[in-house]
């Protein structure tokens, strides 16, 4: 989907992933100290996970291709009196967004990775690598292949996560989780994978381009 397509989904409120609160899986990550500033929320949508970090007093920036989603995130930040910067941009080319100012120590991806075509996955992994240094942690939550049906985003296997992040990253763990959705979702609660992925020593290779 293009930025305009995501904008239209938000305008029509056809956004079952937007539950008005953080995903429970990421709340647990935050509770055990898994969010360390500065934090990057990649594909932040309407901002709930960036705002979770902000509510903990952490420096955080969120990026999304949808102008509509970013406007909603900014409005939430104002309403809640929280400090978080939200930027319209392409997460496949994060190094082209000057306002990001890497490196980030934590990246969260909540429902972004599972929207990509196969060819975009390694581009995304390299885009995130360009924003981080050795030891940074990516927390990734995506639909798993155990979610029945074909509605919604692509289903992702553990092997696909591991292969995508085999360069510049090390997958430390992949745990079964669920992906909370709104009542716009007609099926059972989606099954998900929660991966903890650590940045390896920075290499000298260029970021792959589409």
Where are these regions (language model features)?
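A conserved beta-strand element that flanks and buttresses the S-adenosyl-L-methionine
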Residues: 108
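Short catalytic micro-motifs in class I SAM-dependent methyltransferases
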Residues: 111, 115
């Amino acid at each position: 989907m293009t930025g305009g397509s995501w904008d239209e989904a938000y305008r029509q409120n056809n956004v079952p992933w937007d539950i008005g609160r953080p995903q429970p899986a990421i709340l647990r990550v935050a509770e055990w100290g898994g969010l360390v500033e500065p934090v990057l929320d990649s594909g932040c949508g309407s901002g709930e996970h960036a705002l979770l970090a902000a509510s903990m007093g952490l420096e955080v920036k969120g990026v999304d291709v949808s102008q509509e989603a970013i406007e909603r995130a900014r409005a939430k930040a104002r309403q809640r009196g929280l400090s978080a910067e939200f930027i319209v941009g392409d997460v496949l080319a994060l190094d082209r967004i000057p306002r990001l100012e890497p490196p980030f120590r934590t990246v969260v991806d909540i429902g972004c990775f599972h929207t990509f075509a196969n060819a975009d996955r390694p581009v995304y992994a390299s885009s995130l690598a360009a924003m981080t240094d050795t030891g940074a942690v990516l927390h990734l939550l995506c639909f798993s292949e155990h979610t029945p049906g074909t509605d919604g985003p692509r289903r992702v296997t553990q092997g696909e996560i591991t292969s995508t992040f085999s360069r510049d990253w090390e997958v430390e763990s992949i745990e079964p989780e669920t992906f909370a959705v709104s009542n716009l979702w007609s099926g059972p609660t989606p099954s998900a994978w929660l991966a903890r992925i650590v940045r390896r020593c920075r290499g000298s290779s260029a970021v792959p381009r589409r």
